[in-house]
Amino acid sequence: MILSSGMQEREAYLQELLPMQQEDLFQVFRLSDKREVIIRLLDPPLHEFLPELENKAEVAELAMEMGINIEQGTLRIKTLKEHNPMLGFRGCRTAILHPEILAMQVEAILRAAVRALRAGFEVHPQIMLPLVCTDHEIDQLMPTIRRTYNKVMDIA
């Protein structure tokens, strides 16, 4: 998903991830019955999910899975590498640039919470948007969260 070449491809990968995240979160809610659960979204830097460029076998395997050549795979990985990832592109900044990732995670949380409630568990999910520096960042993220909330609640 991280290395996808465009929105359509990224959306397809996100649809594959949604049920997996939803199931994981359902299990968390089930096990934490009656306790608050804080889910910290989009926290790790994206490069943590990528193979190291020095590991040619992993890069080649990933490129093959994506249907691209090794050079294209290497280039895509290089574009996501950061000099100091702890200060860079992660948390709310990822959500601002890729609101579709935020929407998928929020949808997974909400669907899992609804499922847990229907199964008789008391759930108290809290969503944390990490690394927020300004009100403006929250203002940019809230429309996606609200839209996703409304979408899930309309079908729940």
How would you name each of these model-derived features?
Residues 1-156:
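Conserved alpha/beta-domain cores
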